[in-house]
């Protein structure tokens, strides 16, 4: 929603700033968003989310969480928060 809002407000003409979001983190966020846009069965999403978190390195979990927060992706923020060890 944050990116959509910036685009609608013509604030994205020169790019959208993503401070402290590396390409590696952005790719993970995009992967998550693509799956959640396409998939409709909640049970399948829960399985996919579990695998997504299982393969995520603990060292980048906080970075994904911060990106989800900055980009206002509440479901990803909730998922990463619930997987903090």
Swiss-Prot record:
List this protein's GO terms for biological process.
Answer: auxin-activated signaling pathway; jasmonic acid mediated signaling pathway; protein ubiquitination; response to auxin; response to jasmonic acid; ubiquitin-dependent protein catabolic process
Q: Name one GO cellular component term.
A: nucleus
Q: Does the keyword Nucleus apply?
A: yes
- Pathway(s) served: Protein modification; protein ubiquitination
Pfam families in UniProt: Skp1_POZ
SMART domains given for it? Skp1
**Which keywords fit this entry according to its UniProt record?**
Nucleus, Ubl conjugation pathway
Q: Where is this region: Interaction with the F-box domain of F-box proteins?
A: 65-85
InterPro entries the UniProt entry points to: SKP1, SKP1-like, SKP1-like_dim_sf, SKP1/BTB/POZ_sf, Skp1_comp_POZ
Q: Where in the cell is it found?
A: Nucleus
Instruction: Report whether Chloroplast shows up as a keyword of the record.
Output: no
Q: Where is the signal peptide?
A: none
Family stated for the protein in its record: Belongs to the SKP1 family.
The record describes the protein's role as: Involved in ubiquitination and subsequent proteasomal degradation of target proteins. Together with CUL1, RBX1 and a F-box protein, it forms a SCF E3 ubiquitin ligase complex. The functional specificity of this complex depends on the type of F-box protein. In the SCF complex, it serves as an adapter that links the F-box protein to CUL1.
Q: What's the miscellaneous note?
A: May be the product of a pseudogene.
- Note the subunit structure: Part of a SCF (SKP1-cullin-F-box) protein ligase complex.
Q: What is this protein called?
A: SKP1-like protein 6
Species of provenance:
Arabidopsis thaliana (Mouse-ear cress)
Its gene name is: ASK6
